């Protein structure tokens, strides 16, 4: 019951936040005559793997409905699962991701231009065929590096960073990756440790650019990975 009440409260808070953002967008930016070209509102969601980015993204989708376009940053990974390059880089390293390509795509979508991009399938670790992406009034980019490049930060109108306490992050990541991605708990824990330095180097510093930081922390003790 407490969890349901917390979820309802969070949804209400999110709805109010979006209402304020939309009012600013509609009556501020879009009504300003100096903006000769209509631009769409870009929302960024950043944070480490397993912090709850997709959950927040789905909450935004529930609030905004078909006015929202979802873009997930994993589509910019340079290689599919099993490629030898993943022995040299982690997914958190910007050099292992086409972040400049992502920035160009976000810029195009903001300016109401159609793009073509692939998505990353976490079940089989492969990229989809190129898909035609038609921009919408609200666009959310969710991923590991949304605020890494200065030119992309300029294009994102509202930046949300999710800062989840580490024990909860590990718990959520284990539940997700064992259930939906076919990994063993041992493999997940090895992955977490191997990526920790890159998380500290490339992901955590993006928090300073956020307009809003969402923090999740435990209020009760729990066993990590136990459903």
Where are these regions (language model features)?
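Post-Walker A helix-loop "phosphate-sensing" segment adjacent to the P-loop in P-loop NTPases
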Residues: 62-71
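Short hydrophobic/aromatic beta-strand immediately N-terminal to the Walker A/P-loop
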Residues: 43-44
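Conserved lysine of the Walker
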Residues: 53
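NTP-dependent small-molecule kinase module
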Residues: 2-36, 134, 175, 179, ...
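The conserved Walker
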Residues: 49
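ATP-dependent NMP and nucleoside kinases share a basic, alpha-helical "lid"
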Residues: 128-181
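Hydrophobic positions on the alpha1 helix immediately C-terminal to the Walker A/P-loop
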Residues: 56, 60
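Conserved nucleotide-sensing/catalytic segment adjacent to the nucleotide-binding pocket
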Residues: 69-70, 78-125, 138
């Amino acid at each position: 019951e407490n969890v349901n009440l917390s979820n309802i409260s969070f949804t209400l808070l999110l709805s109010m936040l979006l209402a304020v953002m939309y009012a600013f967008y509609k009556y501020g930016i879009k009504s300003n005559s100096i903006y000769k070209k209509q631009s769409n509102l870009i929302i960024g969601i950043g944070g480490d793997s397993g912090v709850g980015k997709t959950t927040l993204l789905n909450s935004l989708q529930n609030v905004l409905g078909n006015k929202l376009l979802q873009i997930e940053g994993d589509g910019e990974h340079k290689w599919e699962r099993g490629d030898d390059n993943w022995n040299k880089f982690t997914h958190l390293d910007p050099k292992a991701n086409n972040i400049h390509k992502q920035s160009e795509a976000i810029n195009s979508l903001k300016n109401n231009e159609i793009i073509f991009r692939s998505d990353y399938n976490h079940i089989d670790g492969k990229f989809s065929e190129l898909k035609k992406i038609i921009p919408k009034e609200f666009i959310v980019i969710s991923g590991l590096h949304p605020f890494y490049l200065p030119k992309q930060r300029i294009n994102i109108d509202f930046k949300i960073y999710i800062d989840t306490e580490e024990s909860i992050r590990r718990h959520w990541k284990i539940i997700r990756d064992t259930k939906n991605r076919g990994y063993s708990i041992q493999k997940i824990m090895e992955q977490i440790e191997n990526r920790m330095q890159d998380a500290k180097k490339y992901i955590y510093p993006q928090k300073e650019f956020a307009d809003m930081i969402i923090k999740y922390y435990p209020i009760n003790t729990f066993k990590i990975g136990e459903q």
